[in-house]
Structure formats: structure tokens, C-alpha cells
């Protein structure tokens, strides 16, 4: 029997992505010791909050989260690698662990996905990093940038290669705030796919809009973003939205995107902003409907 690939199934029906990783990790009440594990890191940085390290130090936690999402019916689970590139990991002094984190994170998700009888898929998460190319972080010198395009490209390439080696079906470039960062990530993903010979790997690109006019933090609207990223690689199969301003506020930008692009469209919103009591009005039931 022919193996069901991600692209095959994408043509047939709507696929369900898993939910948040960070908030699920919070439920375990982990300590600094959980993030340190047996890594013997004594660089003066607190590691608690560097969730990507948990694929090395507490794989049981990440495995449990993956399994719970699959048991709930998810078709796709996302790796715990959102900040697992050298640029973000340098803030913790753990950039030397990037290859291990991505490979082990992908391998762990792959193992859990393969436990289930029907085809389940693994998306290797590649976040926006902690540096942006379109916006300066120096108000006194707005022309300055904290990172170069080539540095981003190299960091993303290192990440993408290990995610593919670990067995992902999709490279998910998500929470895109800056189109230039996104282009670097897609170019790196494209390069990694071709170097690995894994042409069946899809690229999924997901932007985060910051206002009702469907603009990214950089000021670009969603149509311009979709046009820019669609042409970056022949492996880009999906363009979508994530996080942003909650379910209801995401619907108008989503409709605009769906009307504009010929690619498949994805959406995975957050719960929006808290109300005056510090609570979220969006319930799981409301999000599901």
C-alpha cells in the first residue's frame, strides 16, 4: 500500500494542528533543576524558561504533551524547538546545544506520532528569533541592526537540517513578525530540504498580525507578506496566521489571506488579550466552535 504523505492528506481534508506547548509545560511546575538536568551548565544564566532544553533534560514532559494532543485527535504535532537556533539560545549561553535540541526534539515527536495507527505528522517549529532585521532595537540609531541576514540564514539552516534529520514532515516557520526574518528562515528551510534530499518535506509559514488592518509588526499587510513568502521556495505549501489577537479578531485577516493566496491556509490563534480581571474570555469550547 502506498504511504499516505502529508501532501496527499492535505489535498483531501482539513488537518488539525496541536495546541500550545508553553502553557502545557507550565502545568508541570518545573524548577531550574528540571531545565539543568545533567547538562552541567554553569555559565551564570538561569535556564528556567528555556523550554527547548526540556527535550534533553525532561523528554518525558514533552513526550506526554505530544501524546495528549495526538490522543485528542491532532493530525500534526509541533516540536519543542521554537527558540532552538543559535541566536535565541545565545541569550542562555546554550548555543552549543542547538544541533542536539533540534535532532532530539524532532526524533521524540516522530516516535510519539508513529505510535498511532492513522497517519500523524510532525512539524519542526522554527520561531522568529529574538532579533529582527526590519526594525532596529536601538532608538538612538534606527539604522543599526542587531543581526545580519547571513547570520539569520546560517542559524536557521543549522536548525532546519537537524529537524529534517530527526524525522519531521513539515518545517513550520511560525510567529513571523518580520518578512525579512521569514525569508531567511524559508531560504534556510529550502536549502536544508534540498541538501537532505527530502523533497517530500513541506514548508508551512505562519505570520502574526498585530492590528485589525492585518499588519505585521514590521508594518507589512498580510497580502504583501503572502506574496513575498510564496515565491521564496517551491516547498511552501501553506501560509497562515497564528497567535495574534484571539479567535474573533483573527477571522477578518484570515478571510483576506484566503481570498488572496492560492496556497493552503492555516490558522492557530491564541486566547487573545486578558480582560480587566486578568482572565481570558476565550474558552476551549468557544475556540473549538
What positions do the PLM features span?
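Domain-level signal for soluble alpha/beta catalytic cores
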Residues: 1-289
Amino acid at each position: 500500500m502506498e504511504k499516505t504523505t502529508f501532501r496527499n492528506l492535505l489535498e483531501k481534508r482539513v488537518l488539525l494542528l496541536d495546541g500550545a506547548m508553553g502553557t502545557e509545560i507550565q502545568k508541570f511546575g518545573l524548577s531550574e533543576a528540571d531545565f539543568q538536568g545533567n547538562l552541567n551548565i554553569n555559565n551564570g544564566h538561569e535556564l528556567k524558561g528555556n523550554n527547548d532544553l526540556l527535550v534533553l533534560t525532561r523528554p518525558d514532559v514533552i513526550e506526554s504533551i505530544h501524546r495528549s494532543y495526538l490522543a485528542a485527535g491532532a493530525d500534526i504535532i509541533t516540536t519543542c524547538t521554537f527558540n532552538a537556533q543559535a541566536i535565541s539560545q545565545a541569550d542562555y549561553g546554550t548555543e552549543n546545544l542547538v544541533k542536539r535540541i533540534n535532532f532530539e526534539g524532532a526524533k521524540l515527536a516522530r516516535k510519539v506520532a508513529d505510535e498511532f495507527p492513522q497517519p500523524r505528522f510532525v512539524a519542526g517549529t522554527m520561531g522568529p528569533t529574538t532579533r529582527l532585521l526590519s526594525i532596529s532595537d536601538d532608538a538612538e540609531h534606527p539604522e543599526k541592526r542587531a543581526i545580519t541576514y547571513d547570520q539569520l540564514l546560517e542559524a536557521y539552516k543549522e536548525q532546519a537540517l537537524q529537524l529534517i534529520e530527526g524525522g519531521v514532515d513539515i518545517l513550520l516557520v511560525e510567529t513571523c513578525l518580520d518578512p525579512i526574518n521569514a525569508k531567511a528562515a524559508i531560504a534556510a528551510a529550502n536549502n536544508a530540504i534540498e541538501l537532505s534530499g527530502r523533497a517530500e518535506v513541506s514548508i508551512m509559514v505562519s505570520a502574526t498580525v498585530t492590528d485589525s488592518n492585518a499588519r505585521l509588526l514590521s508594518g507589512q499587510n498580510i497580502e504583501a507578506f503572502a506574496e513575498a513568502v510564496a515565491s521564496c521556495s517551491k516547498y511552501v505549501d501553506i501560509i497562515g496566521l497564528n497567535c495574534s489577537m484571539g479567535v474573533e479578531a483573527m477571522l477578518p485577516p484570515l478571510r483576506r489571506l484566503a481570498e488572496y493566496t492560492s496556497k493552503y491556509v492555516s490558522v492557530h490563534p491564541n486566547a487573545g488579550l486578558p480582560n480587566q480581571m486578568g482572565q481570558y474570555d476565550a474558552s476551549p469550547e468557544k475556540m473549538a466552535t
